[in-house]
Swiss-Prot record:
Essential cofactor(s): Fe cation
Organism of this sequence: Pseudomonas putida (strain W619)
GO BP annotations, alphabetical order: ubiquinone biosynthetic process
Cellular component, GO annotation: plasma membrane
NCBIfam families: DMQ_monoox_COQ7 (NF033656)
Gene name in the database record: coq7
Protein name: 3-demethoxyubiquinol 3-hydroxylase
Cofactor note: Binds 2 iron ions per subunit.
């Protein structure tokens, strides 16, 4: 029977550093699933549409950077092995989203946000602190974050033209995955955050969306 490998604190820090590099360096994320955009037709968008869609996809890409950092921070400090594994699995799925968003941003002639390292560091710290408090709080933070992401995705789907089936296909699949992450976190015992906490999280999310839309 296969035995589970136990990592030392140094091993985990090195793994975290490797994940951070793969998250932040261009073209370094290798998705396990092909982009949903591949099978969708190319359409011609005007300059204004292209610029706006690129801005929305940049926001979504940074959101995935934050999610990746959040999961990694929580996995580092999670108390129960099964919670750590759940965080690591969710982080692997977020790599798909990262790669898909970056591919689409490049296709639109734009680039990911230069603020990604800042948001990665902040999110990693928040995730690590949540994990140190308790696994219940950590899982609750995942659920609240993913619900916020789903809200942003819904708003973006309303703004992206129906003819841009490539961008829409990516966001629609991301929404399915994010909702599943939120449900799984709550089913695993995650704490349901009260409205004031969720409101504070939404205010922080607005700072991210406003700043990364253009840069």
């Amino acid at each position: 029977m296969a035995t589970e490998r136990h990592y030392s604190p140094l091993d985990r820090l090195l793994l975290q550093a490797d994940t951070a590099m793969r998250t932040l360096l261009p073209f370094s994320g290798q998705p396990s699933r092909p982009s949903p955009a591949i099978v969708q037709p190319d359409v011609e968008l005007d300059e204004s549409q292209t610029r706006h869609i690129a801005g929305l996809m940049r926001i979504n890409h940074t959101g995935e950077v934050c999610a990746q950092a959040l999961y990694q921070g929580q996995a580092l400090t999670a108390k129960l092995p099964q919670v750590r594994k759940a965080m690591e699995h969710a982080a692997e799925e977020e790599i798909d989203h990262l790669a898909w968003c970056e591919q689409r941003i490049r296709q639109l002639g734009s680039h990911p946000s230069v603020l990604n390292p800042l948001f990665y560091g902040m999110s990693f710290g928040i995730g690590a602190l949540a994990g140190m408090v308790s696994d219940k709080v950590s899982l609750g933070f995942v659920a609240a974050t993913e619900h916020q992401v789903c809200k942003h995705l819904d708003e973006h789907l309303e703004q992206i033209p129906h003819e841009d089936e490539k961008s829409r296909a990516i966001l629609e699949q991301m929404r399915v995955d994010e909702e599943q992450h939120a449900d799984s976190a709550l089913e695993a015992g995650g704490y349901r955050f009260p409205a004031p906490v969720r409101f504070g999280m939404s205010m922080l999310a607005k700072v991210m969306t406003k700043s990364t839309y253009r840069i």
